[in-house]
Swiss-Prot record:
Required for maturation of 30S ribosomal subunits. It comes from Thermoanaerobacter pseudethanolicus (strain ATCC 33223 / 39E). The lineage of its organism: Bacteria, Bacillati, Bacillota, Clostridia, Thermoanaerobacterales. This is Ribosome maturation factor RimP. Pfam families: DUF150_C, RimP_N. Its main location: cytoplasm. NCBIfam families: PRK00092.1-2. One of its GO terms (cellular component) is cytosol. Belongs to the RimP family.
Length: 151
């Protein structure tokens, strides 16, 4: 996490805790000629536009007071979306029993992607039901995990 991302995280936590929101991620990056500070939040039942506005206004005021960013930037506060990557233990726990896609750094059985039902997460292992069989993956070998969205 960059210094600016850490500052934004520290500044936003009081309003998140007060409203029982979860901080999913903070990103500070340049896209084209613009810098973006993105804050992704969530809560049980989902985030609303009013929730995003509340957090955005609060964080904007705090950032103006501290002024940690020397150049212009765009502040965005949003929900992480349905297909957000699973990163934290809570993300995995929330998705037990659901379909996920696992991407690996190196292939296993000539495959780098596996899709199956998440049946267990131990912190250092992901266990899915893949083709009717239990399959384990060490987190150190996993590059990305995301939910499978079916409509």
């Amino acid at each position: 996490m960059s210094k600016i991302e850490q500052i934004a995280k520290d500044l936003v936590m009081p309003v998140l805790e007060k409203n029982n929101f979860e901080l999913v991620d903070v990103e500070y990056k340049k896209e084209g000629s613009h810098w973006y500070l993105r804050v992704y939040i969530d809560k049980e039942g989902g985030i609303t536009l009013d929730d995003c506005q509340l957090v955005s206004e609060y964080l904007s005021d705090r950032l103006d007071e501290v002024d940690p960013i020397e150049h212009s930037y765009i502040l965005e506060v949003s929900s992480p979306g349905l297909d957000r990557p699973l990163k934290k233990p809570r993300d995995f726990e929330r998705n037990i029993g659901k379909e996920i896609e696992i991407s690996l750094y190196a292939p296993i059985d000539k495959r780098k992607k596996f899709e199956g039902e998440l049946i267990e997460f131990t912190g250092d292992k992901i266990i899915i039901l893949y083709n009717g069989e239990r399959k384990e993956f060490d987190m150190k070998n996993v590059s990305l995990v995301k939910p499978v969205i079916k409509f």
